[in-house]
From Swiss-Prot:
Protein name according to UniProt: Auxin-responsive protein IAA17
Gene: IAA17
UniProt key word Cytoplasm: no
Expression sites by tissue: Highly expressed in etiolated seedlings and flowers. Expressed in roots and green seedlings.
Entry function: Aux/IAA proteins are short-lived transcriptional factors that function as repressors of early auxin response genes at low auxin concentrations.
Chief location category: nucleus
Family membership noted in the UniProt record: Belongs to the Aux/IAA family.
Subcellular locations according to the entry: Nucleus
Length: 257
């Protein structure tokens, strides 16, 4: 009895054997689109086997840990060391510059230069110094002259008095007016006397003054105008302390006259 035939009622194609599949794949490779120049054939690539070896590095892909851990060549290491040395040297230079700036800021400033005289033809140094000194003296004299034109206040002190007073010599015309004013200022400090004039008569207190030169002299030994211009300070001192002032005052007034 013959075996029954299988009829394809659904329209299925008969199964193709494996050899036929391989031939079909070869035919498809011939018509496959590939990148390359005309007439060139790229080699066939076989799929990699399933092994534990590291995959070859693809072009443009990230590097793996093994590639990163590779040691640098000697030239690259030398270049890196040179770069670090330059950075360290630059840092040291910056620190040195900062220290120099601090030293310059902490250094004391130079004193102001003295007044110098400039001229042509060139002036010698000793003449410059002489002319500068003369200018300073003239400026001081002008200041003193201006002071003499206005008010002339001088300090007045008395031995035993706890305070000082100031008087304007320009407001008095003679020694008598000045003595009367001082008597009113220091009344009460002359023990056992009616006033300063009585004490002066007895020699207990003497009116003295300090002149421009810093010398102490008795009041009344020179003309009033000369006294008013040269007086810098008044002092009512005890007669025992004024011993020796009168001769000096007389000699000085004679030299001025």
């Amino acid at each position: 009895m013959s075996p029954p035939l299988e009829l394809d009622y659904i329209g299925l194609s008969p199964p193709v054997p494996a050899a036929a599949d391989a031939a079909a794949d070869n035919d498809l490779k011939g018509t496959e689109l590939r990148l390359g120049l005309p007439g060139s054939h790229s080699p066939d690539r076989s799929p990699p086997a399933a092994t534990l070896d590291l995959l070859p590095a693809a072009k443009g892909a990230k590097r793996g840990f093994s590639d990163e851990a590779r040691p640098l060549p000697a030239s690259a290491a030398a270049a890196a060391a040179a770069g670090k040395g330059k950075k360290a040297a630059a840092g040291e230079e910056d620190e040195d510059a900062e220290e120099e700036d601090k030293k310059v800021a902490a250094a004391p400033q130079a004193p102001a230069a003295k007044a110098q005289v400039v001229g042509w033809p060139p002036i010698r140094s000793y003449r410059k110094n002489t002319m500068a000194t003369n200018q300073l003296k003239s400026s001081k004299e002008d200041a003193e002259a201006k002071q003499g034109q206005g008010f002339l206040y001088v300090k007045v002190s008395m031995d035993g008095a706890p305070y000082l007073r100031k008087v304007d010599l320009k407001t008095y015309k003679n020694y008598k007016d000045l003595s009367t004013a001082l008597e009113k200022m220091f009344i009460g400090f002359t023990t056992g006397k009616d006033g300063l004039s009585e004490s002066r008569k007895d020699g207990e207190y003497v009116l003295t003054y300090e002149d421009k030169d810093g010398d102490w002299m008795l009041v009344g030994d020179v003309p009033w105008e000369m006294f008013a211009n040269s007086c810098r300070r008044l002092r009512i001192m005890k007669g025992s302390d004024a011993i020796g002032l009168a001769p000096r005052a007389v000699d000085k007034s004679k030299n001025r006259n």
